[in-house]
Amino acid sequence: MVKNNIEVDVKVKCIENGMTQVKLAEEIDTTKAYVNRVIKKTDGVINHTFVQMMEVLGYDIELTYVKRGE
């Protein structure tokens, strides 16, 4: 199971960086609708098979975000 709420995480990181989802979409050459669909996806942004493998091995998944140095 993925412990993170990807939708909330992306929204928080957008706020922290003073960026809207529209601007984020423009930066990666896609639409806001696609960005929204990706972060709201019910089975998440993590590969479903990978999640299943980790669950069988007895692990949950937690994503950690590390700001890149500039």
Feature roles, as predicted:
Residues 18-33:
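Short alpha-helical DNA-recognition segment
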Residues 14, 25, 54:
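The alpha-helix within a helix-turn-helix
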Residues 11, 22, 36, 51:
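Residues within the helices of the helix-turn-helix
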Residues 67-70:
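Short acidic DE-rich linear segments
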Residues 1-17:
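A short, Lys/Arg-rich alpha-helix, primarily the initiator
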Residues 48-63:
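DNA major-groove recognition helix of helix-turn-helix/homeodomain DNA-binding modules
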Residues 29-44:
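Recognition helix of helix-turn-helix/homeodomain-like DNA-binding domains
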Residues 8, 18-19, 45-48:
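Residue-level signal for the short linker/turn that defines the boundary of a DNA-recognition helix
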